[in-house]
A protein has these predicted regions:
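Bacterial Sec-dependent N-terminal signal peptides
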Residues: 1-21
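Feature marking well-ordered beta-strand scaffolds used for ligand recognition
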Residues: 18-239
Length: 239
């Protein structure tokens, strides 16, 4: 666990000492409303590469905006997908991509859904192939372990739920995290079935999900960090 914390600190130090970024493009749609709570119009970013093009994803109170950023001299919005829930009540959206699909969630609104967008033919076309609340209505964050085709939905129906993406357009629930010491998973980073969970006021956990392939299985706890100086709210992490 100490090694994990050291790595995170070193990564933070590296990025803090990196060269300053240069602004090459700015986009702001003034027709979009800000959230009622914080007046934030935009709420998330993601990126992916497909068909030799680079794309940026921006979440807003209106939905999902996809930009082709391949040519820095000609950046443009190539796709927009309206959210199932839109407007001033939206504070958070989140995204991850896998196997030619973009997965989109929202953390607010009774009408919110999981959206799956076929992005395999961008920048020419896209298609929303799934837009439903049958699996879950809301999630604060999602993360996809692309090496194992598993989607982790944080603060959704439970503290965290895991879905198989063996069929990328039809996720199947394979785990509901059942740990009485964890009431909320705020964010997650997962690599090769090792899940690093940021559990808010419940601290930090590391689980092994390699044997989790059905709803009856539970992951193995590898490490737990619940008390440390200036702990605060364990919000998010990355490796």
């Amino acid at each position: 666990m100490k090694n994990i914390i050291t790595i995170l600190i070193l990564l933070f130090s590296f990025f803090c000492n990196s060269q300053e970024a240069n602004l090459i493009y700015n986009w702001n749609d003034t027709s979009l409303v800000g959230s009622w709570a914080y007046d934030n119009t935009y709420n998330e970013i993601w990126g992916f590469e497909i068909n030799n093009h680079e794309f940026a994803v921006i979440g807003s109170t209106a939905g999902t905006h996809i930009f082709d950023v391949s040519n820095v001299q000609n950046i443009y919005e190539t796709a927009f997908i309206a959210g199932a829930y839109t407007g001033g009540g939206v504070i958070h959206r989140d995204y991850h991509d896998f196997d030619g699909y973009l997965y989109a969630v929202c953390d607010e609104g009774s009408s919110s859904t999981l959206q799956i967008i076929d992005i395999s033919n961008l920048p020419y076309s896209f298609n929303v192939v799934y837009d439903d609340n049958a699996l879950f209505n809301k999630a604060h964050n999602i993360f996809i372990d692309t090496s194992t085709a598993k989607l982790y939905a944080c603060a959704s129906n439970n503290a965290m739920d895991v879905y198989s993406l063996a069929n990328p357009v039809l996720p199947v629930l394979i785990n509901e995290l059942n740990d009485p010491t964890i009431g909320h998973v705020h964010d997650a980073y997962v690599r090769n079935d090792t899940a690093y969970l940021n559990c808010g006021n419940d601290g930090f956990r590391v689980f092994d999900y390699s044997n989790v392939n059905s709803i009856s299985n539970q992951p193995n706890l590898l490490g737990s960090l619940t008390s440390y100086p200036d702990a605060g709210y364990n919000h998010s992490g990355w490796l």
